[in-house]
Swiss-Prot record:
It comes from Burkholderia mallei (strain ATCC 23344). NAD(+) binds at residues 274-288. FAD binds at residues 13-18. It holds the Pfam family GIDA_C_1st. Residues 636-657 are annotated as: Disordered. Keywords: Cytoplasm, FAD, Flavoprotein, NAD, tRNA processing. The keyword NAD applies. GO terms for biological process: tRNA methylation; tRNA wobble uridine modification. InterPro entries: FAD/NAD-bd_sf, GIDA_C_N, MnmG, MnmG-rel, MnmG-rel_CS, MnmG_C, MnmG_C_subdom, MnmG_C_subdom_sf. This is tRNA uridine 5-carboxymethylaminomethyl modification enzyme MnmG. GO terms for cellular component: cytosol. Signal peptide: none annotated. Belongs to the MnmG family.
Amino acid sequence: MLYPTEFDVIVVGGGHAGTEAALASARMGAKTLLLTHNIETLGQMSCNPSIGGIGKGHLVKEVDALGGAMAAATDEGGIQFRILNSSKGPAVRATRAQADRVLYKQAIRRRLENQPNLWLFQQAVDDLMVEGDRVVGAVTQVGVRFRARAVVLTAGTFLDGKIHVGLNHYTGGRAGDPAAVSLSSRLKELNLPQGRLKTGTPPRIDGRTIDFSKLDEQPGDLDPIPVFSFLGRAEQHPQQLPCWVTHTNERTHDIIRSGLDRSPMYTGVIEGVGPRYCPSIEDKIHRFASKDSHQIFLEPEGLTTNEFYPNGISTSLPFDVQLALVHSMRGLEQAHILRPGYAIEYDYFDPRALKSSLETKAIGGLFFAGQINGTTGYEEAAAQGLLAGINAGRYAQEKDAWCPRRDQAYLGVLVDDLVTRGVSEPYRMFTSRAEYRLSLREDNADMRLTEIGRELGVVDDVRWDAFNRKRDAVSRETERLRTTWVTPKTLPADEATALLGKPIDHEYSLAELLRRPGVSYDGVCGLRGGECGPSEPLAEDELLLAQIKEQIEIGIKYQGYIERQAGEIERNGANENTRLPDGIDYTEVRGLSFEVSQKLNQFRPETIGQASRISGMTPAAISLLMVHLKKRGLGRRKGADSVPGADVQADNTAAQQ
């Protein structure tokens, strides 16, 4: 039957990408339908019970700055919070949280059920409705046909998924869930370029059978307790729990080696490529043969379960080998396995067949997000889902897409890497992938993106008000520090020595004092009995006050580096964002080699910047392209139109601070 209501956007899949996509399009006012094979698994953490980490935490903060749900749900469900790289510079500091699976899933579902303009429907999707070169809806497994102007496909590992435990295998999207076989076949009929990838998960362990007295305890950060959302509070966190650390040993490695003849990875049964930065324990033993031990983190799955996730032993070895390798580790000698580990092999589609909006080039209105694009990780999926949801909503509203730049957000880096370079293995975000990471910090994600989110319609009044109070306070206080001066006469020598190590010998602004190593904002404001502090509190709320102080300190201490990077962004921006016409035939560009013109015609980059990052492109080829565009009066700056964010420049110094 044809469902009587037509929607603006249909989202297929209720994982981390799908939930963010549905919430984003609905926040924009688009009538949105979220189709899932099981409403009870909305927002489910299919693998590890954690959110964030290096690069990943940056994405979560950006999703939050744009009104997304992941950070807030983590604050409500997080049972341990830590700041990674806390002793290093602000560019690489990252938040990571262990999450209670049940509480996290409840927080996501609560937001979905209370979001205006969003409808839920439980049915697996078997087919897409395509008319000509555009998608017009989706068909469920019992034949219900839903029409929409745009469809976002977030199928995760479900497309023709195959689960492997040893040499045994069966179809499945994840343990306990069916694979999307019909939908996978339908997508192949559309001639979208696809391949196979694989990922894996470790066996789960009953905490009642772990000897914690033999393990090293790893508590979370307590002073202060981190929060993920810019609107979050530590008081939202439930009870906090420690993680525990054990190690593999030579006996463990011998057990693993003895089972490789029954490993689907090492017998050619699995053809898909696995994630380089989250390898199976089989891969670790093989690739790092000289190491006699690997660290294993035992992570609690929640407050109401005894289940532990042994992070570091993802495996598809036969169950008897899994049991033996677990029992070989300190503290796990009597451990009971609740669920066996497994590998899952699934279809993905070459992201080079996508526009930067995550819309497929071949089929108008069809957007892909998450693992279907060859990425790995909840955070990468959520970020893509948010962007796809925004652009699906804008497509339905007949507005131009928003495509964040590499200098604007890690989300821009992620998407640009995918659509220009493609993937040969599951893609994971790291800070090292960003050229401008000093400008793309966790702490300033809201300064970079919340104003854009407001223009896009995904930032509500509460977030907008908090952001403006923070931004205004940072601006006012930074200016006060730059224009307030102390001299040897007005600053007592003993106070200067206590703060700076010696008396001052000439006039300094408070900002110049703050720029010195080891000097804090509170230290400067405490000079002269507190007279150097602001006349009024910067904020009544303690969390907001801490965020304001952090922005002020980083902005002043790193001012020179930030301004230098802003200049680099401006210099590179002219060519980086120059658009390439949609219909250009690169064989007609004089001087281009056949190989280069063939690649350009195949991948159809949207900008000169994207073209420059295609494998095999040379500076000479880029110069020839620029000459071709100039001669024919083609090309314009990407973002030089009415797209939100075009006038919110990432090189604005205030936004970087």
